[in-house]
């Protein structure tokens, strides 16, 4: 309560000094009586000086009657007393007599012997139970925790305040604070008590409106936005509203106005506080926009260099405005210039915006720590290396290293290297944050910094009792200032403020409109104001500490035991006060840090709080934070709730007037200012947990009622928690017991056993007898692509005649743990369970399309329900891989030998049909498991879907082949005719990657007539439906497919199929993209000795760019015979050009096989290839315009064919050098050096030879045999006439043309 205190002028102090001098003179030579009289006189003078005229008159009478011996002393005393009586005495109102008077008196005394800690504790216990703990743990000695909790809603009891400040804090606490260098020093005088700051809109007596806009009077957007941001800070608005009495005094008396604002006038003068209060009232009372005249008219007094009409910085104006308000408040005191800095930092503005940073500098040599404290009113955060506000805070409070040898250590007494780190010693009530967006040269950093409406700074609190004794540092966003513009010298300022209703509004000068929370958090903010949120954090420590105390005392659930426990706590108030009033342990509950009490006691608090709920209104916070404990982890849930509260419920605690969603009515009563009716018997536990509504006689009833309130409040707060946390509780009731515990914050795994998987029944007969195999050591592949045959072999572990089965047991087990199923799929499981899993798991993905199982690092999309379910798992071992490959190669060898014997009967339709049928029978017999109907799956290899035939009959009969072909035509993916597209850059031959491509190799070695006759039996292969799987094959230079060329009538119906080595079936050149010269058997030395070069190519083709059937998985040479390819290629050229007598030989060019020489195809091949070479050169000349746009792949630059295989075949060959590397020849001799061949330079003109055209890109690969020695024949001229439109499609199947011979180069240069 206000106390009138007499304050004497300077003359009073001078008179007292004269009296003291007179006393000293008399005592030196005076008698005992004189000393006694002097003592009484001194006392009388002091009393008269402080008491009044009546007391001094009485003392004068006594002194005159008894001072007969010392007349001189008497005269001096009388004269001094008269001066004191005549002196003018002014009275000043003080809020606290103890702090203003008694604390000043303490400085006049010297403590002879400091009390022991036990005596201090005893003195504290004899006083108030909460005094010592509150005073010690308060904010720097003047922030009383007990008073702050009560004063937020009203006034505390005078007895508590007087006892706290007089007894214990005046003796030992202040001395401890002043003597401890690691603690913030206590100010000698507090101008404005911190607990008087009213936090939140509900603490005010008035109803706060949204606020009117402010008119821009000329580049004053910075002023308008700053004022709007300040007026929407509840603490500042409440304080300005409480200055009504000062506002009236400034208007009435010029002296008061002069004292408040410097003597400027009768209407407020220069008092900027009055100007702010008037402007605030104008915004609240007017519905239309106002002019902030009281502020911009005093702009020169606020800041001397600011001019009206000029653009200014909003943060600079904010700092000058707050400083001017502080100065105006200090000028209310006559001796404000004599106040020290700590006292000046206790003004209302500093109590609202001010805080203290603790700076710790640690020497790296002697580990000496130097601690200093720094006052701040805003934090300037560097955002150059941050994208979020939390990252900026982490960078600000992180430990930084001082420059080497630049810090002088107090311990080492020398310059050493050190580290420096900031922490929050005392956090401000309103935190002002400025993002450093502007540089010294005026540039602006316009990056987006994301922030949350609620932040927690508890993790940055200093490790000191005072810092730990603060409230949990949870802040909510109340206002911010944004800047729109690209530089400091231009732009526009706007403000966003939080109103009492809990909604945000955008204030753009005179325009005021609501804004959504998402828009607020996405703004390009410049200055942000966060205010302490006392409602939400206060409930959390009370509940948690309540649980800790009950656990430590054995779970008291009865009224009598609680009363006994409360009496014990009242007898030992020091410990309880430390725990209850100091959230020393509770600050660690917010954020990632754990409480000092440990997790063991915390894990059992849920049951205690739910059954014996003594918290009345705040138990819902505990219920939410303890909710994740049901899943087994409590700590994650606490931090999770905090994060969800910041993200999903930013406005919790803002609608303070209603208060129903956040606090129960009992707690609301305390918030309105009602203190405990029985403070003596009510202990600290009841004070903190029940918030002043403790009635020990009604404990049981309160517990029952609060348990119901707890459930209701839990339901109200459930939407605040994150969605996955809610799902975890709901799914826990549905799903079976999971094998591994899952944290609430962890994302749910794919499948995750959410629901029972539904398997797709392929046939009416189901055999749910299989069981999921146990996975012990999953195998890892060295090659990231699946083999074509390994899945077929592993999936066809059952007999080939078995019907498709679905195993629901294995499906459910695999779906419940998809990660185990994925690992299990990589092992060689039993036959039946493997098939069951391959059918059930993909079907589970069909029902859950968002769950894609990853195989080899690629996500697989589920197939539609109409198609066979796709398996995405590798289910074979390396041994199965080798066996399947060997079987396929054996079947290929047998077929090749068969084809060599029948090569003279290629135009006989009946013979070709029989050969084809026999070949199919051999293939199906050797790889019967490949055609098994139990593998009705289309495996996905590295993101490329592959198809597989579906057959239900036995694979040992010929009907299997025909039915498989029919099914393949239906699904556009037959295992005997179509091949899947292999990966774009396969690391190994494509024939092994694809299970169907191998079949196509054996089938597609037939010539055109063979296919025409075969189409009569297998009509499905020429179905006009374009196969979707083969659509991507033309982009793959390593495809192992070889589609048989259909008849001319049906040639354009299906999409183009690739040959075995990557070329199109309609092109004469067979190769893997490497154009070669004609290697005719025994034909003028053009191909007889090409084995050396081809073998060299075959040895290096395992790098992924060579042929698709050169090397096996173990790196050995395959057993595949290469003769049929040469014959087929020669025949295809002859057939397409009208030469049906004999097939021409052709180098396959892709390193597929060894060229065999035959005397029957020499002349035809020479004539054909010469013509084709001429046509190819003409086409290349026409494509020179697209040279630079279609450069070849740099990864294949080093691969090029030579002119001939080795020097044996032709004298024109220039690669007879031993150790010749055909892969390096193109790079070293042809393109770059270009010295040995004397060819044109790299960038040649169109007049140069067109044979160099194909060296630049892969687009023009003509799959033709170029003239090796300039010789050739006739025929095949029309080969390219109807293929020109398709040649640009052959980029994926081509490589580089062969280097021309020396004769060709000379001829081309001459031409």
UniProtKB/Swiss-Prot annotation:
Bias kind Polar residues: ranges: 869-879, 1060-1081, 1246-1255
Annotated region (Disordered), positions in chain: 120-189, 546-575, 587-620, 640-1095, 1136-1311
CDD domains in the cross-refs: Peptidase_C19E
Bias kind Acidic residues: ranges: 910-920, 1006-1020
Gene Ontology cellular-component terms listed: cytosol; nucleolus
Keywords: Hydrolase, Nucleus, Phosphoprotein, Protease, Thiol protease, Ubl conjugation pathway
EC category: hydrolase
Gene behind this protein: Usp36
GO molecular function: cysteine-type deubiquitinase activity
Enzyme Commission number(s): 3.4.19.12
Protein name: Ubiquitin carboxyl-terminal hydrolase 36
Tagged with keyword Protease: yes
Compartments in which it is found: Nucleus, Nucleolus
Compositionally biased spans, kind Basic residues: 836-853, 896-905
Classification of source organism: Eukaryota, Metazoa, Ecdysozoa, Arthropoda, Hexapoda
